[in-house]
Amino acid sequence: HLLQFNKMIKEETGKNAIPFYAFYGCYCGWGGSGKPKDATDRCCFEHDCCYGKLTNCNTKWDIYSYSLKDGYITCGKGTWCEKEVCECDKCLRRNLRTYKYGYMFYL
């Protein structure tokens, strides 16, 4: 779910997803093309690919449960789609801290 994804990003980076990540690099936000600009943009690319594989799921609106303990995200119980969407969303842990302000609103 997009609101849960925003919450995960804020918990991990301290940044709100909309102003900081919605228009970052080539792949963060809606759509994307070209070569990812850095590890943060690559994470967004991987996230898009992960969602793309879940063709029978409502990736942007499936509500899932997760917990955050000692810096680790654990996806909770739910339907197969809910668990898979959570797994896609938690990929952000790896690279979002490499954020560079120069790639905000990148064209």
Swiss-Prot record:
Catalytic activity: a 1,2-diacyl-sn-glycero-3-phosphocholine + H2O = a 1-acyl-sn-glycero-3-phosphocholine + a fatty acid + H(+)
Entry keywords, A to Z: Calcium, Disulfide bond, Hydrolase, Lipid degradation, Lipid metabolism, Metal-binding, Neurotoxin, Secreted, Toxin
Cysteine pairings via disulfide bonds: 28-44, 43-91, 50-88, 57-81, 75-86
Entry's Gene Ontology molecular function annotations: calcium ion binding; calcium-dependent phospholipase A2 activity; phospholipid binding; toxin activity
Subcellular location: Secreted
Presence of the UniProt keyword Cell division in the record: no
Superkingdom to which the source organism belongs: Eukaryota
E.C. no: 3.1.1.4
Keyword Magnesium belongs to the record: no
Active site: residue positions: 47, 89
Gene Ontology biological-process entries: arachidonate secretion; lipid catabolic process; negative regulation of T cell proliferation; phospholipid metabolic process
Binding-site residues for Ca(2+), renumbered to this chain: 27, 29, 31, 48
Tissue: Expressed by the venom gland.
GO cellular component: extracellular region
Purpose of the protein: Heterodimer A-B: Sphenotoxin is a potent neurotoxin that possesses phospholipase A2 (PLA2) activity. It consists of a non-covalent association of a basic PLA2 subunit B with a non-enzymatic subunit A. Monomer B: Not found in vivo. In vitro, potent neurotoxin that possesses phospholipase A2 (PLA2) activity and exerts a lethal action by blocking neuromuscular transmission. Induces paralysis of the hind legs and neuromuscular blockade in mouse phrenic nerve-diaphragm preparations. PLA2 catalyzes the calcium-dependent hydrolysis of the 2-acyl groups in 3-sn-phosphoglycerides.
Family: Belongs to the phospholipase A2 family. Group II subfamily. D49 sub-subfamily.
Subunit structure of this chain's protein: Heterodimer of A and B chains; non-covalently linked. The acidic protein (B chain) has phospholipase A2 activity and the A chain weakly inhibits the B chain enzymatic activity but potentiates its lethal potency.
Name of this chain's protein: Basic phospholipase A2 sphenotoxin subunit B
